[in-house]
Each structure stands twice: as structure tokens, then as C-alpha cells.
Amino acid sequence: MSKDATKEISAPTDAKERSKAIETAMSQIEKAFGKGSIMKLGAESKLDVQVVSTGSLSLDLALGVGGIPRGRITEIYGPESGGKTTLALAIVAQAQKAGGTCAFIDAEHALDPVYARALGVNTDELLVSQPDNGEQALEIMELLVRSGAIDVVVVDSVAALTPRAEIEGDMGDSLPGLQARLMSQALRKLTAILSKTGTAAIFINQVREKIGVMYGNPETTTGGRALKFYASVRLDVRKIGQPTKVGNDAVANTVKIKTVKNKVAAPFKEVELALVYGKGFDQLSDLVGLAADMDIIKKAGSFYSYGDERIGQGKEKTIAYIAERPEMEQEIRDRVMAAIRAGNAGEAPALAPAPAAPEAAEA
């Protein structure tokens, strides 16, 4: 750097000059590294990106743009049996409902078609591959994405992408860094292709414990650091609390999903969803909770009311009441969606007059 250039650098003292300097620097960073590479944490800035809904209104709202972004990589990770594959299949179901074509690369060889159908996936139209090794899985993924005809591609899971050299080697062979190098090379190629084709790529990942960590979080994800960097969205999915029981049988779990990283909107949002065994995420429970938060459904103590109609005592009875009335459910859903689009959850659209309905049981 020349002496003249060094002299030109000086810290602005005036508040307006400092603000202008920050805006200029942010503009230069976005020009060099892309929109969304820097933002103010408290800002509600969003990118105009195409998305695929997750099927959960609360999670779509937490993601800031209405779903997972197309043309980018999303990582879903967490402990075992936390709901990672369920969430990925729910996204596939939503993409198919919108007329999209989806692919599922089952590296774990554990996809349950019966469960997938229960989540709303059209298994007759779902492209499925069960590769023999990690290289084959990522090559298949690249070919699918390059076709430009795939809307969502899921890899389940990164931990199961075993390098060919490891499979062909002897048990106990030390092959450090093979999987990390494989992922790094593949992601460098895939990122640009995804951006051009608009395919949403979902990598499901597992967590491991780092040995000897005394302070901080001992958890880490498999496959090296590359996926952490290339992913535009990272979702931490894990069960919390005790299972919900009916009698002695556990029927559901509460799952907390946190947006650990989000390059298309503000990160660090959290949602809690009910995961019903054999059925997936309870979308109606999610809708009722969100509508109550937005004051579309009024809550007074344990009683819920919609418009002038009291619809139930307690959330479970309210959900059951709405489930029997599809027209009411759709009306509430439309108002919640309108409030989300308006960007103001505190002011919901006015309730349209509805015909009188029989009084809900309060007991």
C-alpha cells in the first residue's frame, strides 16, 4: 500500500459521516460477497428469494422468507430421533403439492415409504437413490441438480456418506479427513449449480461429541467445516421435555427448531412444534398457537374464541373443534397468512361475518 493511500484512511468523527461510512462499507461487502452477506442483527431485512414452504407456518415465519430458500443449501442437524428426516419429508411434501419434482438420496438406506406417505409425500413420484458410497451419492446429486428439473433434493445423511476408500479398506484403517475433503470438493461444485437451477438442497446431518471439551458446547456435526460455510440456512432440530402420553402410551413429542444460521433473513429464531408419532408435525396445533399469538383467535384464561364464538376450553379441545370444521380452519389459515404477508402479526385482518355455529362444549 502506498503512503498516499495510507494517509487517505482516517476515522470519521461526525455521527452522520460514520453512519454513511458504515452504509458504504456494507454496500461494498454485499457487492463483493452477495446480498445477505452482512446485515444488522435487529433489522428485519429480507432477501427477495424463491422458497419452499416447510409445512409449518411458525417455522416459515421464523425463517423470515416463508420457507427454505431455493438455489441454496439448507442443513438440518440434531440428535437422533429429533425429527430431522420428518422435517425434510414435510418440505418434500409441500414442494410436491406445489407441482415440484423431488429427489431423496437415502445414504442411510432407512427411508420408510409408509411413513413418507403419512406425511403427505407422493412416493410414486419421488425419485429415490440408495448409493453405495459417498462419491456415488454426491455424483448422483450433481447430475440431478444439473438437469434443472429438480425442485428439492434431500441427502440423508451426511454421516452416511462414506468415502469409497473407507469402504474398500480394512476395518480399523485410519483415514483421517477423507469425508471432509469429499464434502468440501462436492460443495464447491454444487453451490454454483444450485444457484443457476434454483434447486433447494437439504443435507441432513448428525451430531457428535468432541472429546476433551471442558468448556463451551461439546457437540459438532459430521463431514468437516465445509457444510457449515456453504449452507445458507442451518436448522438445529431436537426434542425437548417429556413425551405427551395418552394413558400409558407416548403419542407425541415437542420439538424445538432453531435457525442457527440464516443468510436470507435474521437468524437465531426458535419455534416449538408438536411431532405426533406416525403422523409428523401437527400443523393444526401450530396454526392455533400462531393464530392465538396474533390475536386472530382470542384467548381468555383457558377459553379460546373466534370472532363472537367460543370454540373450546383448552388448546386440545380447540384443535379438535376446528379440525371438524375445515372451512373455519381455512379461514383462520388465510388470515394468518395475510398477517404474515403484511409483516405485522399484531394487526390481523378483520374477521368476515360467519354463520352461527353450535356452541362448543366447555367441559
UniProtKB/Swiss-Prot annotation:
One of its GO terms (molecular function) is single-stranded DNA binding. GO terms for cellular component: cytoplasm. It holds the Pfam family RecA. Keywords: ATP-binding, Cytoplasm, DNA damage, DNA recombination, DNA repair, DNA-binding, Nucleotide-binding, SOS response. PROSITE patterns: RECA_1, RECA_2, RECA_3. Its main location: cytoplasm. ATP binds at residues 78-85. It is found in: Cytoplasm. Disruption phenotype: Reduced DNA synthesis rate even in the absence of ionizing radiation (IR). Cells lacking this gene have a reduced capacity to survive IR (from 90% survival to <10(-7)), DNA repair following IR is slow. Single recA mutants rarely reconstitutes the whole genome following IR, and their DNA is not degraded post-IR. A double recA-ddrB disruption shows no signs of DNA repair 24 hours after IR. Double recA-radA deletion mutants have a more severe effect than either mutation alone after IR. The keyword DNA-binding applies. One of its GO terms (biological process) is SOS response. The keyword Cytoplasm applies. Can catalyze the hydrolysis of ATP in the presence of single-stranded DNA, the ATP-dependent uptake of single-stranded DNA by duplex DNA, and the ATP-dependent hybridization of homologous single-stranded DNAs. It interacts with LexA causing its activation and leading to its autocatalytic cleavage. Probably involved in base excision repair. Belongs to the RecA family. HAMAP family: RecA (MF_00268). This is Protein RecA.
